[in-house]
């Protein structure tokens, strides 16, 4: 694989690894180049990002590399987070919210087991919009956080109580459930945006 393609692959790996990051050893195993070459490539990418005036940077935290935004751009990100146009929820957030609404209280790992993918970003979005809350800690190893819906969730979706949620289908078809969640929560989003 040529040098530029390797840098592109590494950038993609950094992107999909998210907040957890990825260490040079794992990148080395995936790309089949030495750890030293990976470190050299990352240093070169850091310089490329600076030269090009990119809005992201590569940082090393606890021996793992991450893509992060530049600290000097924080005021713009704050504006985005508080702008009215950002009131809609992503499909991932809607799915996560539906799971919490029907199965609460439950842990992040239980949600991820149901969805089949990570849900940290969706949970953070829902927490920041105050649609879910931390509802204590589960018993067991590590005492993970339990999540439940909030009063704001009920208000946002025009529900008097959780019992007003439609009954989930017995034989759940995941694609059909996604469409129903979008329809239910999408209508409530439209009503609150009017």
From Swiss-Prot:
Domain of life, source organism: Bacteria
Protein's UniProt name: Segregation and condensation protein B
Database matches in NCBIfam families: SMC-Scp complex subunit ScpB
One Gene Ontology cellular component annotation held by this UniProt entry: cytoplasm
Functional summary from the UniProt entry: Participates in chromosomal partition during cell division. May act via the formation of a condensin-like complex containing Smc and ScpA that pull DNA away from mid-cell into both cell halves.
Listed Gene3D superfamilies: Winged helix-like DNA-binding domain superfamily/Winged helix DNA-binding domain
Family: Belongs to the ScpB family.
One GO term (biological process): DNA replication
Subunit structure, as described in the record: Homodimer. Homodimerization may be required to stabilize the binding of ScpA to the Smc head domains. Component of a cohesin-like complex composed of ScpA, ScpB and the Smc homodimer, in which ScpA and ScpB bind to the head domain of Smc. The presence of the three proteins is required for the association of the complex with DNA.
UniProtKB keywords: Cell cycle, Cell division, Chromosome partition, Cytoplasm
Protein's cellular compartments: Cytoplasm
């Amino acid at each position: 694989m040529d040098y530029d393609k390797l840098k592109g692959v590494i950038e993609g790996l950094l992107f999909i690894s998210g907040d957890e990051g990825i260490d040079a050893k794992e990148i080395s195993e995936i790309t089949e180049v030495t750890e030293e070459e990976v470190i050299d490539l990352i240093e070169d990418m850091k310089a490329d990002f600076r030269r090009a005036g990119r809005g992201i940077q590569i940082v090393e935290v606890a021996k793992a590399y991450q893509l992060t935004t530049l600290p000097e751009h924080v005021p713009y990100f704050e504006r985005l987070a508080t702008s009215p146009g950002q009131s809609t929820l992503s499909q991932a957030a809607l799915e996560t919210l539906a799971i919490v609404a029907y199965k609460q209280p439950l842990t992040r790992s239980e949600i991820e087991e149901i969805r089949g993918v990570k849900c940290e970003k969706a949970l953070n979005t829902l927490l920041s919009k105050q649609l879910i809350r931390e509802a204590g800690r589960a018993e067991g190893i590590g005492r993970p956080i339990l999540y439940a819906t909030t009063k704001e969730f009920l208000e946002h979706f025009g529900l008097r109580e959780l019992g007003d949620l439609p009954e989930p289908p017995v034989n759940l078809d995941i694609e059909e459930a996604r469409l129903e969640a979008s329809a239910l929560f999408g209508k409530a989003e439209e009503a609150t945006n009017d």
